[in-house]
Amino acid sequence: MIDTTLPLTDIHRHLDGNIRPQTILELGRRYNISLPAQSLETLIPHVQVIANEPDLVSFLTKLDWGVKVLASLDACRRVAFENIEDAARNGLHYVELRFSPGYMAMAHQLPVAGVVEAVIDGVREGCRTFGVQAKLIGIMSRTFGEAACQQELEAFLAHRDQITALDLAGDELGFPGSLFLSHFNRARDADWHITVHAGEAAGPESIWQAIRELGAERIGHGVKAIEDRALMDFLAEQQIGIESCLTSNIQTSTVAELAAHPLKMFLEHGIRASINTDDPGVQGVDIIHEYTVAAPAAGLSREQIRQAQINGLEMAFLSAEEKRALREKVAAK
């Protein structure tokens, strides 16, 4: 179901949601951190989704063990490097990795700006080693409040040339986008792109707010857009992309089953929607699974899957020249 003549992208992929279970085990041992299990087999149920979680917040707790072992900036650098290695193994040509440095720094009180620098270093080295093209999206974790998000924003601004876009993620219901207007004003002043997690836990009004008040060019998840026909029309007309994450939306109980996922209807409506993973390390999936298993189960035809793959590059935070070069590189292989 993957068209090998086209670039394969993953533009909604959390770096801090893709820490390998084996790495969690190794870092836990290195830094003498108590883990809930001492073997890979027994650790996996604690760090990966085995059965669907009742809601988004429950799902997010699965990520916590991964960041609890980030006891040094070297550990942050390692997981960033491994994220690129994993992308290469999956056959990705281009990946946008998003991360929350405040969340990664929290367990061991690491310097937030230092985490940003370590991630940049790890990703740069990974791209050199594995030949994958990558860009970084900075996440503000809304769950920790406005002041914590301000700290994350300052850390990103200290490395503004290495950050491509700003995102807002976490508890969408408890911390609406209206709390973060000034943060996104500064992001736009920095000439960053804007993507926002919206319409996952909250309704279509959250998507409208992300677009109108925060300046979102893309929406992460956006499943609740299906409830508002005017919004669907607007997304299609303005070419505001939806970063769909099929398996993730089932595991968080945002959508009951793949057959009920709105991605097919988004594509039929002319919305620029793409297929992505979200937190592959926690979910126990990869981009190949999303294309070959999840997308057909969600009712997508072969042509719709191909369109979603095309959309992934069209939606990417790349210049027209970068997109053209990537298409030519893949076509020449």
From Swiss-Prot:
The keyword Hydrolase applies. The active site is at E200 (proton donor). It is an enzyme of class 3 (hydrolase). GO terms for molecular function: 2'-deoxyadenosine deaminase activity; adenosine deaminase activity; zinc ion binding. It catalyses: adenosine + H2O + H(+) = inosine + NH4(+); 2'-deoxyadenosine + H2O + H(+) = 2'-deoxyinosine + NH4(+). Its EC number is 3.5.4.4. Its cofactor is Zn(2+). One of its GO terms (biological process) is purine ribonucleoside monophosphate biosynthetic process. GO terms for cellular component: cytosol. HAMAP family: A_deaminase. This is Adenosine deaminase. It comes from Escherichia coli (strain SMS-3-5 / SECEC). The lineage of its organism: Bacteria, Pseudomonadati, Pseudomonadota, Gammaproteobacteria, Enterobacterales.
